[in-house]
Amino acid sequence: MHVNTLSVLSLVGLVPLAAARLSGSVGPLTSASAKAATKTCNVLDYGAAADKTTDLGAPLASAFADCKTGGLVYVPPGDYALESWAQLSGGKAWALQIDGTIYRTGTDGGNMIFIEHSSDFELFSSTSSGAMQGLGYEFHKDDNWSGPRLLRLYDVSDFALHDFILVDSPSFHLSLDTCSNGEVYNMAIRGGNHGALDGVDVWSTNIWIHDVEVTNKDECVTVKSPAQNILVENIYCNWSGGCGMGSLGADTNISDITYRNVYTWNSNQMMLIKSNGGSGTVSNVVLENFIGHGNAYSLDIDSAWSSMSTQSGDGVEFSNFTIRNWKGTEANGAERGPVKIICPNGAPCYEMYIEDFAMWTEEGDEQWYTCQSAFGSGFCLQSGSDYSSYEATTSTATSAPSGYSAPTMASDLTRDFGSTVSIPIPTIPTSFYPGATPYSALMGAQSSASANVRAVAFGTSAVVSRAGSSSRPAQTGSFLTKSTTAAAGSIMGPTAAAVQGVCAPPAGQGRGAARYGGHRRHGHRH
């Protein structure tokens, strides 16, 4: 049993369960073990070679073609070259298990692996060490920032992506485009120290992203438009750009978003919501349990963001924001204060609430808070309900607030990785927020477990699986299992075996935990 524990700090001010924002179940509908039992397509049988030279593109596409209607595509341990990109379209009830490392050798734009129009899908590494190495520095040293993305999912439903590593993309690392009912977790993303190298970008519906570490100098985990019912938690922005929303332009449509348990170290910001003109709305947002150290900005809602051109419209309207339990320090509060809420004069923000927010400057002895056309409570936010525009107001603090002290993480980086030399492949951490245990143990750490197992046929060998489920009575606002009582088992390759442990629910939430196939389908009600 894998038990979730949270520090006293991270328990402060947790929102009601209904605020978790997911609208329904997330994850694949059938297990990876069931998919593998239907059919297994090993890329080595289609011409691939783990020699870091032979192009994996065609063998991967051929293996997918044979397993796309039900099966598991398997990339065994080893080093593979990818010269021609893989566009994998139209899959149903399939999985992609990458236990090897895929090195970019091609130079085209686009997406190295592009998965689209698929359902009931899972991408994972059973060893938690499978990776894509984009070798982006080969582009970046020539000041070229428009190379390929590593991994993009488009129009994919009921899916999971986990226990996988993305390194040094020439461009963005992971994009979730118009997807639904998905879960992303237990990942490490490490990019160059430069803009335009986004970690995770999501514009989708009903997505749970948790237990992810990002190193780069642009987006950590960022929500773009349109997006609804996104839950982002246990995020480690370790020398990154930081989390955010945007850039937001015309017809913005974002609602029911929660970020919680976000730790940000030496980054551009803890949270940046950026727009410049535009139209539409961002509503029903919770930003809670944020810890930051050494960041340039902390809370930055900027409707006049100068790094984007002005869009047509009176501005994006922000409403019903709860910002709760922020602790830590910013780099220099006199230069960049911890609270900056600049709303459009043509579309003032309203119902903006800041609670239990205590941060202090690392340099100097003062910091400022500034608001413009923003209504609610806390710091410089104005009260009232007429929501008339007003010019920016600034207040200055010259003494530290009580309770601002916050822990650091042992894995906080002491330097960046630059952008012109090769970046090493990291291991996935086992902690992403101080005092919080990941909801699911790493698959690679579970292979030695021995309780409650049974063998499941896998070709001529056996895969060890966790049988059945643990359960609690269903409660409103709890996570529930859905659509399966199958045995749980990760696919470790033709001769290996693994056991899946039971993951812990989000803090304060009971959840039945039928586990299967390296993953489980979560139901969330509120």
Swiss-Prot record:
Task: Report the family membership.
Answer: Belongs to the glycosyl hydrolase 28 family.
SUPFAM superfamilies assigned to the protein according to its UniProt record, in alphabetical order: Pectin lyase-like
Question: GO MF annotations for this entry?
Answer: polygalacturonase activity; rhamnogalacturonan alpha-L-rhamnopyranosyl-(1->4)-alpha-D-galactopyranosyluronide lyase activity
Has the keyword Ligase been applied to this entry? no
A Pfam family it matches: Glyco_hydro_28
The identity of this protein, by name, is Probable rhamnogalacturonase B
The residues the entry assigns to the signal sequence are 1-20
Query: Which residues span the membrane?
Result: none
Chemical reaction(s) catalysed: Endohydrolysis of alpha-D-GalA-(1->2)-alpha-L-Rha glycosidic bond in the rhamnogalacturonan I backbone with initial inversion of anomeric configuration releasing oligosaccharides with beta-D-GalA at the reducing end
What keywords appear on the UniProt entry? Carbohydrate metabolism, Cell wall biogenesis/degradation, Disulfide bond, Glycoprotein, Glycosidase, Hydrolase, Polysaccharide degradation, Secreted, Signal
Keyword flag Hydrolase: yes
> What's a single GO CC term here?
extracellular region
Residues annotated as the enzyme's active site: D218 (proton donor), H293
Q: What does this protein do?
A: Pectinolytic enzymes consist of four classes of enzymes: pectine lyase, polygalacturonase, pectin methylesterase and rhamnogalacturonase. Hydrolyzes alpha-D-galacturonopyranosyl-(1,2)-alpha-L-rhamnopyranosyl linkages in the backbone of the hairy regions of pectins.
Q: Which gene encodes it?
A: rhgB
According to the record, glycans are attached at: N144, N238, N253, N320
Q: Which organism is it from?
A: Aspergillus terreus (strain NIH 2624 / FGSC A1156)
Spell out the PANTHER family in the cross-references: PECTIN LYASE SUPERFAMILY PROTEIN-RELATED, PTHR31736
